[in-house]
Amino acid sequence: SVLKSMELDKDNQYLEHNKQILNVLANGYYNHYVSYLDTNNYVKAVDFYQEFKALKKVTDQSVDFNQYEIQHCIMLAQIYKQLYHNDENAIHFIQKAIDSYQCVLALDENNYSANKNLGILYHNLGVETIMKELPVDADLEVVIVMEEKAVNYFTKSLPYLKKVYKMEPTDEAIVHGIAAVYYSLNDTEQHIKYYNLYRDLKNSNSNND
């Protein structure tokens, strides 16, 4: 194997040649990784990605994987969200999606996509919790717990949406999302403020079309 060849090549006579071969192999693993990124094959995709990283490190120990990791975690989060939407009882996939976005923010706290998606994800979880049908004879304590759970999701949503709003204050979807969160939190003043901003943006954008 190439790795064995590098180990035996004490004088580094074939170092560059071996590195070129490893680069080709690494790129092959990366291409397989990309082609397997879907809800059916994502586990295999992760394996290919790890193989790609391992070979890349051999060819260049100083290689910076941050951008690869960011893209990888964003793609995995999207897959986990889709798996959850396919089966809403599989709540563990939503936690995996959250963890994946948090992985992105650990590398780049201002990443637009991760902040936006986390904000929307928490908001949607709050809405889903409220919309979940309870038995007619549901205990009051159960109802209160559900309401508290929804409020917790909405509260978690706000910092991410607010951060994205600072980055892109003309994004209609974000402004509307913030207004919706404040509405759900019964904060009428803030809801009206952001709803008016949303309405003004919508009118402004329609006039520009």
Which ranges hold each PLM region?
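Short coil/linker segments at helix-helix boundaries
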Residues: S1, Q13-E16, K81-K96, N124-Y160
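Residue at a conserved register position within TPR or TPR-like alpha-solenoid repeats
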Residues: Y29, Y36, Y80, Y122, ...
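Flexible helix-coil transition and linker loops at the boundaries of alpha-helical arrays
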Residues: M6-I21, A54-E69, D87, C103-N110, ...
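Terminal, low-structured helical/coil segments at or just beyond the last alpha-helical repeat
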Residues: M131-P159, K163-D209
